Amino acid sequence: LPIYVLKAFSKLYPCLKVVNIVENVNKFRGRKFPISLGIKSAKYDHIVLAGADCVPSGFEWLKNLARNFSGKKEVVLGFCTYTKQKGLFKFLLQYDNLTTAMNYMGLALSGHPYRGDGRNIAFKKDLFFKVGGFTKHYNLPLGEDDIFIRNVSTASNTTVSLTPESFLSSDAKHTYKEWKRQKIDRLSTYKYYKPSIKFLLSIPNITTLLFYAFVITLLLLSLPFEYVILAIVIKFVLQILIYFKSCKRLGIKRVFIFAPLIELYFLLLNAELRLLSLFRKKK
C-alpha cells in the first residue's frame, strides 16, 4: 500500500504504526529486513507474522492465535491454506501446503519443532533478539519461518494452533513456474536443518520408494497379480485415510482423494528441483 494510505489508516486505527524507510537500504532478497524493522518498532512483547495477501478465518483470528501463549509457550505455529485456485495446479498447491503442515505440526507436537508457516506464526519479541534476529541468514531469500524457528523453538516452548478460527487463507496468485522457483529457494534453507529432522522428513519418500520397489519385485517374480493389486489398494486406502483426517482437521477439501497419485508426481518433482538447485549453485 502507498505510504499515504497507511498514514490515513493509522489515524483511524491508533494501533497501526507505520515504519517508513526513506532510503533503499534493503539490499537483501525476501522480506526478512522489513520484518526486522517492524519487530524492532513493535510496542508489545508478542509478534505475529502474516502474509500480506492472507485473509483471517474470522474476526477473532488474532485472539484465537494469541491464546496459545500460555504457561511456558513462546512460539505458536499457525496454519494458512490456499483459496481460489482452479485446475490441477490447485491440487498441487493444496497437497504441498497440506503435507508441509502435516510435517511441521506433527513434528512440533511430538517434541521436534523445526519450522512453521511464515504466513501465520507468532513468537515472543525477546526470542528474536536473543538469537540476533535474522542476521545470520540475511543472505538467504527465505528462513524467517524455518531457520529462525529452529534457533528459538524447543519441545517445551513451542505449540501448534489447530483452532479453525486461528487459520488464515491466501489467494495464491503465483504461476506454476514461480511456485517451482520458490520451492528451489526453500531448498537453500534445508541444509541448516538438524540431521535428525532431515532423517524424519525423508522417511515418507524412502518408504514410498521402497513400496514401489516392492511392487516391481512382485511383478518380476511373476507372483499372482492379485497380490500386487492388494498391496497397492492397502497402501492407497491407508494414505487416503491419513490425508482425510488431516484435511478434515485443517478444513481442506477433496485433496485426500488424489493424495496417492499426487505423491508420485512430487517424488519426480522433488528430484528435478534438487538437480535444478545444484545447477543454480554452480552458476
Task: Set out the residue ranges of the language-model regions.
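Catalytic donor/gating beta->alpha subdomain of glycosyltransferases that bind UDP-sugars
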Residues: 69, 75-100, 126-129, 133-197
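Acidic donor-binding/catalytic loop of UDP-sugar-dependent glycosyltransferases
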Residues: 52-67
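Short aromatic/hydrophobic "clamp" motif used to bind/position activated sugar donors
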Residues: 47
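Acidic donor-binding segment of Leloir-type glycosyltransferases
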Residues: 1-25
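Glycine-rich, basic loop-to-helix element that forms the pyrophosphate-binding segment
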Residues: 22-42, 64
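Membrane-embedded multi-pass helical conduit in multi-pass membrane proteins
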Residues: 205-281
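A conserved catalytic-core signature of glycosyltransferases
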Residues: 30, 116-124, 143
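A recurrent flexible, glycine/aromatic-enriched loop bordering the glycosyltransferase active site
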Residues: 82, 104-122, 165-168, 194-200
